[in-house]
Amino acid sequence: FCNQKIYNAEIPESLNGALLVTNHISRLDVVFLMLSTKRKDVIALTASNYRRALFFGTILKKLGVIWLDRGESDFKAMRETADYLKKGWIVGLAPEGRRSRSGKLIKAKPGAVLIAMKTGVPIIPVGLVGTADMGKAIRKWRKMDVTIKFGEAFYLPEQEENEHNRDYVERALDEIMCRIAVLIPEEQRGFYADHPRLKSLLAEIEEAKATTES
């Protein structure tokens, strides 16, 4: 039902636990995310209100997900996530915490940073494009065009001396979101479009390209 392009989705079996962090533009995001890599030990956090959805809920239950009660601190889901990571699983989540109706990045919540701080696992950014177009595709009797780009794994930046915890979490969260923003078109970067860290990452990419071509 879609034309799908997937880039750099090879997650080595030797990678023992990692967070997959992605932008969130569609209910289908978690399905595409979990099926885009060949690794079988992949699970994702998903809002518990989808559990009762007849069609979509059935798919999610079959895939296997961690149900998250959105809008409150779901410590059970956080503990379950940490347990999977400690067992070496790959866990997907959307740092924004909810679907962006505009398709553009919205300000993220600190959950992804707190999990990464607790577990120390690497983080793999993923950019999703086109997953929100199912309704449009059905109306026009055509396939969806979906692009999924995986970035390089990275670790949270180190906390600086005398840096307040709240400031550090915000800086680490910006790092995660800017690494996602690099993987999606400019018009989807939304809240993070003008972030200095994003500009720095884009400059690094251009510099690497120039070095390769010379």
Where do the model's predicted regions map?
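Short, flexible active-site-adjacent loop segments at beta-strand->alpha-helix junctions, enriched
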Residues: 10, 24-25, 48, 71, ...
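A residue-level signal for beta-strand positions that form part of recognition/binding surfaces
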Residues: 3, 17, 41, 145-147
